Amino acid sequence: MSWRTTTAILCLYGAVKEFRPATPFLTPFLASPEKNITLDELYSQVYPYWTYSYMLALIPMFILTDILRYKPIVMIEAIGLVATWALLVFGKGVWQMQIMQVSFGVASAAEIAYYSYIYSIVDRKHYKRATSYIRAAALMGKLVAFGLGQTLISTHTSDYLVLNQISLGAVCLVTIIAIFLPRVKSEKAKVSMRAHEIVEQQTVESVESVQTPKAVKMSYTREYFKKISEELQICSKNQELLKWSLWWALASCGVYQVQNYTQSLWKELQNNPDDVANGVVEFVNTALGAFLSLFIHHLSIDWTRHGQMILFITSAIVAVLLYLCSQTTTVLVAYSSYVVITSIYHMLITAASANVAKELSSNNHGLIFGCNTFVAVCLQSLLTLVVVDSRFLHLDIRTQFVIYSGYFALVASIFAFFFMISLFSKSSNAHTAQTTYEATNEIQEETVFLDQN
């Protein structure tokens, strides 16, 4: 199967798995008489379970993604989504919604396979284009879903439960699509062959001391983790890779947190609970995200030169908008700010994915993508535990957004610092080059003078 065909199937998978019209209305649905869960229970007892389960599930997921070569992990994501929406449709009470969030956390962790799968089948020269395609496909799925959801709610054609039933049907369909994804050619055979050669050599030396199947398995395991260690050591010396990975982790942490709790803020600002425009907001947000994900592919930006400056400016903008959200009494301001924040993130995470993939020297994209996401979710878990969880500060929703604003201000400060170092380094290098040039000219002039005399 050609890489174009595989990319098309992967894009179809991404579009259908994101076709979940109920997503923008999750908080109104859970707080409605249908589920009868209070807002305080939602953001202190239910939603934190997604963050914690996501963090714990990421560890095996980003290791197994490369070992199992992507497809099985994609299947786990699909099954996790089915379990999530089955619980949303049929479940009752706080504890079942907690299980629902755990299931969604596992599915979210497995999503790493979807975004790294493409790099195992596409030549390096196509990374930027392929990244744009798969991210745009996922965003287009959201676009259609959110538009449909808002239309059905605004026209009173259906209620929140029907939206969740439609979402359940979509995630069941995506499980079938996942079956048709081709398996990526495994590197395990090559490693196992090398391990088998080692075992055969050991057998010649001491037949009684070797058990071939076990030795082969242990040799493969050692070989794989040795490869991981070597890959991480190489990555730790790549400044460009570290820069983008740092932004990926820090920005994803903040944006995930905002996405998790923004509906709680909107709920507080909405005067009429029956007149909810969450779907419109997510529709516009997703349309912009899809456009920017494709548009950035056509921009000729020197990310090595201008990356720190762009990351600094955009993080500062996000910090200002989040503070505005925390102080506003108008839901339209909160809606608009959210759209700008997530659009910035969609655009830059596409650039980050392509730049990180470009810097990698092997097929361990699942490992590196997983490491970045794992750091993000660890930070988010800490943030959730301290700021949101009922066992710690348990801050009100507006104060939470003040904290998130301060968090992005810190991110902006970090990249401002890197930007200043970069400017100083360039200035210093330019001065050194100029001094060297002048010294060389003086030597040449002296040489000419001596030759003439």
From Swiss-Prot:
Spans through the membrane: 48-68, 73-93, 102-122, 136-156, 161-181, 276-296, 306-326, 331-351, 368-388, 401-421
Biological process per Gene Ontology, one example term: transmembrane transport
Disruption phenotype: Worms display defects in folate uptake, reproduction and movement.
Subcellular location: Membrane
Pfam family, any one: Folate_carrier
Record membrane topology: Multi-pass membrane protein
Residues glycosylated per entry: 36, 260
Tissues showing expression: Highly expressed in pharynx and posterior part of the intestine. Expressed at lower levels in the body wall muscles, head muscles, and vulva muscles. Highly expressed in the intestine of the early larva, levels decrease in the later stages of development.
InterPro entries in the cross-refs: Folate_carrier, MFS_trans_sf
GO molecular function, one term: folic acid binding
GO terms for cellular component: plasma membrane
Alphabetical keyword list: Folate-binding, Glycoprotein, Membrane, Transmembrane, Transmembrane helix, Transport
Function description: Folate transporter.
Stored NCBIfam families: rfc
Family, as annotated: Belongs to the reduced folate carrier (RFC) transporter (TC 2.A.48) family.
Protein name in UniProt: Folate transporter 1
The organism of origin for this protein: Caenorhabditis elegans
